[in-house]
Amino acid sequence: MQYKEVAGGICAPKGFAAAGVHCGIRANHSEKYDLALIKADVRCAAAGVYTTNKVCGAPIKVDRAHLTDGYAQAIVVNSGNANTCAANGVALAEECCELVGKALNIDAKDVLPSSTGVIGQPMVIDPFARGIPAAAAKLAADAQGSTDAATAIMTTDTHKKEYAIQFELGGKICTVGAIGKGSGMIAPNMATMLAFYTTDAAVSPALLEKALKTVVPGTYNQMSVDLDTSTNDTLIIMASGLAGNPEITEENADYDAFVAALTAI
């Protein structure tokens, strides 16, 4: 199967915009971007794969609850605080989803939160109350939007990570884009790694989840740096279906091609 590298990262597929802003989440008062927002024009088939650690971050608990129907429309990510082992963690993650829902005029249950950073630190809603509306106002469906979001999810990373490819499904050009973070503490089985995929391919929620779970063991779970498994490992994909290919609803040649494209990313 042939692929073409394209610019734009998570904003390369049709129907997606992204942003990154600084809102003051880090305890050291760093001016770095620390909040990313990814928004789809339509409700998307969505799936996630998470840490195997018995202790998981509050956002993962919320993600699992929000993904029971297999759909989502936005992802909100903060860096600098893991929102793990905090008494109010789940409530705060849900409140972040409410803020995103209000800012984007979508259902809060269609928002998937994610966090990375220091474990066990207090976390308050104030930075999110400032940052989420700012990120919503800054959303851009272009390469800069993807780059800003990729920058905002970094912690100890020395380089941002984003990529996108195009391929053909059912006679239509489809695109998959991704951003990720992970530098130190990314082992075994992903550990402190976040990755967010967008695609305009039409894939049913069930087959999207199956494809993601097929790809992860031979790709992300092979990474090893310092033998720690994080509480916050997260890989989420949203599929807008706007490429116009026949929806993948069974394991056929198009499904195999889609899995191959995810593996290539």
What are these regions (language model features)?
Residues 1-91, 95, 101-265:
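A structural signal for small-residue-enriched, beta-sheet-centric alpha/beta enzyme cores
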